[in-house]
Each structure stands twice: as C-alpha cells, then as structure tokens.
C-alpha cells in the first residue's frame, strides 16, 4: 500500500502543476475495486486534506476491494472523509465540478470494459470535464494500444516509473492526453525480473550511438550508404531513407 501512497501523491502533484494549484478546485474521483481504485482513494484523501472540495464515488462495495485498496478505504473513514457507493451512472453529480479523476480500471484489464463499467465511462466522457487518468485511461489494454469498446478520453494521464505500450501506440495514445511519467520507486530488481520483448528506443539513445563528426567532415569522409528498398508504387520509404542519409 506504500506504492499506492506514492502513486496518489504523484497524481495530486500533477493536478496541482497543471491547474496552477489546488485552491478552489472541485474534483470528482471515481474508483473501481482494484489497485487503480486504491490509488484513487489515496488521491481523494490527499486532495481533501489539502482543502479541496472532493466527491468520491465507488463503483463497488468495499467488500469487493483488494487488500491494499481496503487499507486506503479505511484511512478515508479514519480521516472523516465520506465516499458514495453508486449503482448506475445516473447517480453521478458532475455538473458543479471542475475535473474528474478516473480510477476505475488500470493495467489489469484484458479485452474491453464490462457493460456496467462502460456505461460509467461513457457518462464521464460526455460530461465535458477534463479527466485525469491514473496510470491508464480506463478501458484501454496497457499491452496493445488497441481500443476495444468504451474507454476514457483523458486530458492528462499520470503513470509511474515506466510507460506502457498503450501510452505510446495509437489509437490508444490519443486517449491518454498529456502524459506525465512520474517515479514512485518500484524496486529495480522487480522491474528487471519482468520479462519483456519490447524496448523503447529514444532519440537520446539513437544520438548516442552515432559517431562524432570532425568539424571539417563532409560527405566524402563519412562513408557511403546503399539504400535497397521500395517497389513500383511504394517508393516513399526508399526516398525517406535516402533523404535521411543525405542529411
């Protein structure tokens, strides 16, 4: 649950930075039953303790929560902060608020959101309010970037330590809005132990692999490039590769 504390703190920091402080904001936090919902409970507590007007909706009773999320639900109660269990999207009161925190579904989803979750997602999207997604907009598959059904269209997505494929690949990338990559201190050994055949190549890595050129270098001193590519009607890639070599 300590990671949830840190995740929630990073989300609050990003909200404060993007909205030029927390003063005067009226925020709705919508929580599912999983770890993403637990992060949302931390956000709700920290916002309320910062003097923000917060309404926290739970899509499931606390008896359905995971262990860590239950801990943070208890902390809310200990702080005297109320939550509201809702059965349908019609119970959400959104019109008088400034923004929504989406904590319905996280990286554990496979396939599409269930019909009940999808109904809440659709109502949040139609509200016209900016939405801050915790880790991943609800409804997206973190591992594919595919949109299969209803998904939150976020203004800001706050994720932790490493980006997910859905943060980088379209069409899912479009639903993430601005992406804030923050650190919460996942153990390096745990990250290294996660098998992955996907590697993120950055411009810094590519630039670091290029040899340094002499100040008096020119095209005659830097070797030759042969481009073998393209076919009739499909010559765009060949042209781009040749232009890149010339530059």
What feature does the model see in each segment?
Residues 10, 71, 83, 90, ...:
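A broad, structure-centric signal for solvent-exposed, well-ordered loop/edge residues
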Residues 97-99, 104-196:
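Internal gly/pro-rich beta-alpha loop/helix module
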Residues 1-60, 66, 156, 167-247:
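Small-residue (G/A/S/T)-rich helix-start motifs and N-terminal tracts that mark the onset
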Residues 13-104, 112-134:
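Nucleotide and nucleotide-moiety/phosphate-recognizing core
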């Amino acid at each position: 649950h300590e990671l949830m504390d840190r995740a929630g703190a990073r989300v609050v920091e990003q909200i404060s930075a993007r909205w030029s402080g927390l003063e005067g904001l009226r925020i709705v936090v919508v929580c599912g039953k999983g770890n993403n919902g637990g992060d949302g409970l931390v956000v709700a507590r920290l916002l309320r303790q910062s003097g923000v007007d917060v309404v926290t909706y739970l899509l499931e009773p606390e008896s359905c929560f995971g262990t860590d999320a239950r801990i943070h639900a208890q902390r809310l109660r200990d702080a005297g902060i109320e939550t509201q269990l809702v059965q349908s999207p019609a119970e959400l009161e959104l019109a008088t608020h400034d923004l929504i925190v989406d904590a319905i579904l996280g990286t554990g989803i496979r396939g599409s959101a269930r019909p009940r979750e999808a109904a809440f997602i659709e109502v949040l999207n139609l509200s016209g309010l900016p939405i801050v997604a915790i880790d991943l907009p609800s409804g997206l598959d973190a591992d594919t970037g595919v949109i299969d059904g209803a998904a939150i269209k976020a203004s800001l997505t706050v994720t932790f330590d490493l980006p997910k494929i859905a943060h980088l690949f379209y069409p899912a990338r479009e639903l993430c809005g601005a992406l804030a990559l923050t650190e919460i201190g996942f153990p390096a050994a745990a990250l290294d132990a996660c098998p992955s055949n996907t590697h993120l190549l950055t411009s810094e890595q590519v630039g670091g692999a290029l040899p340094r050129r002499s100040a008096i270098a020119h095209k005659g001193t830097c070797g030759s490039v042969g481009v073998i590519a393209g076919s009739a009607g499909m010559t765009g890639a060949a042209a781009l590769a040749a232009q890149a070599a010339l530059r």
